[in-house]
Amino acid sequence: MSTSAQQLGGNVFATPPDEPMGLLRSWLDAARADAVREPGALALATADADGRPSTRMVQVLAVRDTGLLFASHSGSRKGRELAANRWASGVLYWREVARQVVVSGPTGPLGADEADALWMARPVATHPMSVASQQSAPLTDENALREQARQLGDGGVPLPRPDAWLAYLLEPESVEFWESSPDRLHRRLRFDRDGTGWRSDRLQP
């Protein structure tokens, strides 16, 4: 395990903080400092109204006291599933530092102002394809889609956010921190919402 990870290690499990989000930010910062290849890559699982699951990778845009922020098209599979069933679960796995965090809870879209701000913070070069693409719809003509995106990007200026491009917040009901141990007594610490606060428990590996 790297130096940055070690500095945030054992004491956290022996004496947990009162809430998990500050610890999650610290672990994410440590992953970045230790050159984890994609520290913000979240494996996000959703399910439809019948409970049939699907999973994909999304990018965590921010860790707030209220949850994890990411963006997606409302017409994508995850967008449709979240509209039917708000519960989701995501895993941040950092192989390089032998850690993972699992965050589970209700997930829904934020307001237009926040979505606009996130959209405008993205590189302008990402705008044309995000505007042209109807995410998860069948691709019938790849060249036509590429040409549409090229034309949209000809001006090299920011494009308006598509109505379907939304900011989502995963509001945790539970957060579990896991850290590998050579003796297989891997360290696990789970936080669960308890009224207005949090309860924490050490778990067996």
Predicted regions and their residues:
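Binding-site signature for planar aromatic cofactors or substrates
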Residues: 1-205
